[in-house]
Amino acid sequence: MGKGTPSFGKMNKNYTHIRCPRCGRHAYNVAKGYCAACGYGRSRRLRRYSWMNKKVNRIRIR
């Protein structure tokens, strides 16, 4: 098999994300070694932003 379009079909065989040890979500990137949801592996502090929560009546709820 060459290096063109047919080869790109073989790129989705392995796992990109597994279950995170800290938050339990399916967002731990095996190749990069950190969780996309909570930041485990990249930071000791929990990854948290204000835009993650939904606004109701212009007040951000948790």
Curated annotation (Swiss-Prot):
GO BP annotations listed: translation
Keywords: Metal-binding, Ribonucleoprotein, Ribosomal protein, RNA-binding, rRNA-binding, Zinc, Zinc-finger
Functional note: Binds to the 23S rRNA.
Cofactor note: Binds 1 zinc ion per subunit.
Record: residues binding Zn(2+): C20, C23, C35, C38
GO molecular function: rRNA binding; structural constituent of ribosome; zinc ion binding
Gene: rpl37e
ZnF region ranges: C4-type: 20-38
Cofactor: Zn(2+)
Family: Belongs to the eukaryotic ribosomal protein eL37 family.
Source domain of life: Archaea
Protein known as: Large ribosomal subunit protein eL37
Gene Ontology, cellular component aspect: cytosolic large ribosomal subunit
